Regions:
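Active-site region of glycoside hydrolase catalytic domains
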Residues: 2-50, 74, 92-95, 102-485
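A common structural microfeature
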Residues: 14-16, 60-63, 80
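Active-site mouth loops of central-metabolism enzymes
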Residues: 51-65, 138-141
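Internal amphipathic alpha-helical repeat/solenoid segments
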Residues: 62-71, 92, 101
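Catalytic domains of carbohydrate-active enzymes, especially glycoside hydrolases
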Residues: 65-86, 290, 294
Length: 485
């Protein structure tokens, strides 16, 4: 059978099917049990930063509804749940340990294991303690060392039960969107600080990998959001150069230090005016390139790039707020993102499933030291509503997910070493500067009652997981609703 649909079933032994969330987007309980402000709590309080003035204060109340949410994961048949721990909950001021915060994650891990679900832990999904931001944030090299203290706390509490440890999720966002464009927390628009943040997050990653490896961790990795960079006109030198710049800032500035132990030469030259060379110290790149056991790939869409003015495809860096963002493309602020006329999600992102196949195959072709890959986020935002019969029809999201799963299968057929797929997201949640206006979940959340209702996409994903197992057993319920509690 050729892999034109997800019914293709030659998945590698042990292939993991999961779903993902992030602490700041789902937990709520913003100041409960010792937690203090993260940069996102502080950012959301500033008028105009978040669409509709939304905040993550309550989110989807996962902090209080966690056991029911884990039961829902079990009902869906997930192999794994990818979640993040909140630095602002574990070390509220960035420097002292909060045992109540760690206790929550210990209970979560125990619930997952009891349900037969593999915990997949991310240490940093953008919620830096506000106190550390006030000390300079990621532009301050000391923050990398404070991250190791935090990682050690989490490992001490959970290392006996958690196998998979991801240091960072999408450092592109927490550095370039947070410190250059300002559309993400902490909302700074300082290119030199953004470049320093990139390097210091790399350094924090490497320091944590070495520290946790020494303590016995066996599966250590990082998750990067990666995209194909496609020149609008491959014969046009202006478009070729724009595509090179985009690839440098979106992909290679993150991949190369980790996998090759060096920044790309063109990136060093491009960012020399913004201080990249100034923040690199002797020995840093040896630390940063510490071997990893897996690489998480987050991918939602790829991008056509031009060096000519073109507003047909958006600006490539806006968020949901009315705040005027700067460009995250430091030194390449002129690049544009022409539309290809493809269908678009509610995020205004083009839908091109084959882009994921191309990306996964390209990774293996370009990086000799590439570890096994996991697609750690892939999903789509669309408008959806609970119907009178209790259903949540979301055919566009369902098709998006199944088409991208098929693309992963084609990449595996082509030789890509991909070992898992996590749909984003398990639950509708706080979508950063878009607030609650964009829904990615395969489970609908009524934000007024916190009632969970599995969408058609969740049911389809559950059926796919069951069909993909060598010896499928049991049936997927026709409809599943988790009540408000």
């Amino acid at each position: 059978m050729t892999n034109n649909t997800p019914e293709w079933n030659n998945w590698p032994d042990g292939f993991i099917w999961g779903s993902a969330t992030a602490a700041a987007q789902v937990e709520g309980a913003a100041w409960e049990d010792g937690k203090e402000d993260s940069v996102w709590d502080a950012f959301a309080r500033m008028q105009g930063n978040i669409l509709n003035g939304d905040t993550p204060e309550t989110a989807v109340d996962h902090y209080h509804r966690m056991p029911a949410d884990v039961a829902l994961m079990k009902e869906l048949g997930l192999d794994s749940y990818r979640f993040s721990t909140s630095w602002a909950r574990v070390r509220p001021g960035g420097r002292s340990t909060n045992t109540k915060g760690l206790d929550f994650y210990s209970r979560l891990v125990d619930e997952l294991l009891e349900a037969g679900i593999l915990p997949w832990l991310t240490l940093y999904h953008w919620d830096l303690p506000q106190a550390l931001e006030e000390a300079g944030g990621w532009a301050n090299r000391d923050t990398a060392h404070r991250f190791v203290d935090y990682a050690n706390d989490v490992y001490s509490a959970l290392g006996d039960r958690v196998q998979h440890w991801t240091t960072f999720n999408e450092p592109f966002c927490s550095s370039l969107l947070g410190y250059a464009s300002g559309v993400h927390a902490p909302g700074r628009q300082e290119p030199r600080a953004a470049v320093a943040a990139v390097h210091h997050q790399h350094l924090a990653h490497g320091l944590a990998v070495n520290e946790l490896r020494a303590r016995g961790a066996q599966q250590l990795g990082i998750t990067l959001n990666l995209s194909n960079s496609i020149p609008r006109d491959a014969s046009d030198p202006v478009d070729q150069e724009a595509a090179r710049l985009f690839d440098s800032l979106q992909n290679r500035i993150f991949l190369d230090p980790i996998l090759r132990g060096s920044y790309p030469e063109d990136t060093l030259q491009d960012l020399e005016p913004f201080g990249l060379g100034d923040v690199i110290r002797e020995g840093d790149l040896e630390v940063i390139s510490a071997p990893i056991d897996f690489l998480g790939v987050n991918h939602y869409h790829d991008d056509m790039i031009s060096g000519h003015p073109d507003s047909s495809g958006g600006d490539g860096h806006s968020g949901g707020s009315g705040r005027q963002p700067a460009s995250p493309w430091i030194g390449a602020e002129h690049i544009t993102f022409p539309s290809r006329g493809l269908p678009r999600t509610a995020m205004d992102w083009e839908v091109n499933p084959d882009g994921l196949r191309k990306l996964l195959v390209r990774m293996g072709e370009e990086y000799a030291a590439l570890p096994p890959l996991y697609v750690t986020e892939n999903g789509a935002a669309y408008e959806d509503t609970v119907q009178a019969d209790g259903s949540v029809p979301d055919g566009e999201r369902t098709q998006y997910i199944l088409d991208h799963i098929a693309a992963v299968g084609r990449a595996v057929e082509a030789g890509a070493d991909v070992r898992g797929y996590f749909v984003w997201s398990l639950l509708d949640n706080f979508e950063w500067s878009w607030g609650y206006s964009r829904r990615f979940g395969i489970v609908h959340v009524d934000y007024s009652t916190q009632k969970r209702t599995v969408k058609d996409s969740g049911l389809a994903y559950s059926r796919h997981i069951a069909a993909s197992r060598p010896a499928a057993s049991g049936t997927v319920p026709a409809r599943s609703v988790a009540p408000a509690v």
